[in-house]
Amino acid sequence: MVLSQLGSSLVTALRKMTSSTVVDEEVINTLLKEIETSLLGEDVNPIFIRQMVNNIKKKINSEDIPDGIDKRKLIKDSVFEELINLVDPKTEAFKPKKGKTCVLMMVGLQGAGKTTTITKLALYYKNRGYKPAVVGADTFRAGAYEQLQMNAKRAGVPFFGIKEESDPVKVASEGVRTFRKEKNDIILVDTSGRHKQDKELFKEMQSVRDAIKPDSIIFVMDGAIGQAAFGQAKAFKDAVEVGSVIITKLDGHSNGGGALSAVAATKSPIIFIGTGEKVNEIEEFDAESFVRKLLGMGDLKGIAKLAKDFAENAEYKTMVKHLQEGTLTVRDWKEQLSNLQKMGQLGNIMQMIGLNHPMFQGGNIEKKFKVFMVILDSMTDRELDGSAKTMLNDESRIRRLARGSGRDIREVNELFEQIKLFQQCIDRLPKAMRAQLGNCNAQPNEAAMMQQMQRMLPKGVNQAQLQQLMKQMNAAGLGGTGKKGKK
């Protein structure tokens, strides 16, 4: 996870406070000192930390706490709120709309990962039903044209560039004009970077901006620079009216917290963070969701948004229909597994849910799902359109699949047992509850749903985790039997 060491330190500090026999001034001061030390270790500006600590102290002043108020909960809530304030610029960013062309101009220093981020962003939007295209207007860096062209091809998105052209304004203008005609709804324009901020760089960016008139300018910056991000983000914002920021390389450095808080202080909205080198390792940034995952609280908002994106695809609707009818096919399972992998890392999805059971651990489940996909890719159309139960009853097919996929017979059996178990879980639901599968407008009856789900989950998942998972299912459109609203 991004900033996992910081998250671990903060969680440990809060647990110490919670387990204290008496929460007095000494316990509170120890907690705040540990939080301060943890944030300093992430290169967060000491001024920001001091302001945060003072805000927490004001909220938990013992003299102002009424009788009957849970002091431990008040302290935890105050820390949670102030951590959000630390990384939240409280400024809305531009959001593209499907079917309406928008031009996004990408700027940043050389080495920040701008060209790679453009590809990640294009694939992110492509997987959510947009028609993105990329324009290679970085005419300064050697190899920029070839890198973006190759990345775009791998991501399956259109690319425009003029290899021998040295004028970035001409390339950007022609690229935007071309993709407007082709009705692409997101046009991502790569621009030249430099090793440092200089007048020449800003002048070139301003010329490109004036020529293509972007709907938003996105500044891509390296998270490794820590609190120095404040000056860098402010300089770019003042030069070309940066509309939002993407912070890269947050997975491998201890300065990420400093970068996030510094950018937030410039009032520039952070829209995405880079979480790894892979093309799908980019996350939409939301301050509350980020802090929830940091503290291991689960991210209801994030999983609900993911579920909304997920539920819009036609394959999902087909799967819901088959689940309701009790006719789930192996192909349904394969398509949804593929969609999950496109939407983002499975480990990140498990963090959103906030479950710590071994079967839900990110690394384990990603490795397992990759094995499952290898097996599924070895199946014939006839086998894919059949049921898991049919496959389990045919030992010769199981052996053939194991040989064809290069996997163990045990792994092949495990795949079909998982699919079979999933269908059985749905079959155990009452008919009224099953009828609401996929209905995002239904209001769930949580008590009834909890009783039904207790038999479905593995041992070791506690009541709180079960309730949280149930909320996620409702957010995903796997709702309960509550009454529908009036039409």
Curated annotation (Swiss-Prot):
SMART domains: SRP54, SRP54_N. Coiled coil: none annotated. It is found in: Cytoplasm; Endoplasmic reticulum. GO terms for cellular component: cytosol; endoplasmic reticulum; signal recognition particle, endoplasmic reticulum targeting. Its EC number is 3.6.5.4. GO terms for molecular function: 7S RNA binding; endoplasmic reticulum signal peptide binding; GTP binding; GTPase activity. Residues 1-295 are annotated as: G-domain. GO terms for biological process: SRP-dependent cotranslational protein targeting to membrane, translocation. Keywords: Cytoplasm, Endoplasmic reticulum, GTP-binding, Hydrolase, Nucleotide-binding, Ribonucleoprotein, RNA-binding, Signal recognition particle. GTP binds at residues 108-115, 190-194, 248-251. Signal peptide: none annotated. It catalyses: GTP + H2O = GDP + phosphate + H(+). Pfam families: SRP54 (PF00448), SRP54_N (PF02881), SRP_SPB (PF02978). It is an enzyme of class 3 (hydrolase). The keyword Lyase does not apply. Residues 296-487 are annotated as: M-domain. InterPro entries: P-loop_NTPase, Signal_recog_part_SRP54_M_sf, Signal_recog_particl_SRP54_hlx, Signal_recog_particle_SRP54_M, SRP/SRP_N, SRP54, SRP54_euk, SRP54_GTPase_dom. Component of a signal recognition particle (SRP) complex that consists of a 7SL RNA molecule of 300 nucleotides and six protein subunits: SRP72, SRP68, SRP54, SRP19, SRP14 and SRP9. Belongs to the GTP-binding SRP family. SRP54 subfamily. Component of the signal recognition particle (SRP) complex, a ribonucleoprotein complex that mediates the cotranslational targeting of secretory and membrane proteins to the endoplasmic reticulum (ER). As part of the SRP complex, associates with the SRP receptor (SR) component SRPRA to target secretory proteins to the endoplasmic reticulum membrane. Binds to the signal sequence of presecretory proteins when they emerge from the ribosomes. Displays basal GTPase activity, and stimulates reciprocal GTPase activation of the SR subunit SRPRA. The NG domain, also named G domain, is a special guanosine triphosphatase (GTPase) domain, which binds GTP and forms a guanosine 5'-triphosphate (GTP)-dependent complex with a homologous NG domain in the SRP receptor subunit SRPRA. The two NG domains undergo cooperative rearrangements upon their assembly, which culminate in the reciprocal activation of the GTPase activity of one another. SRP receptor compaction upon binding with cargo-loaded SRP and GTPase rearrangement drive SRP-mediated cotranslational protein translocation into the ER. HAMAP family: SRP54 (MF_00306). This is Signal recognition particle subunit SRP54.
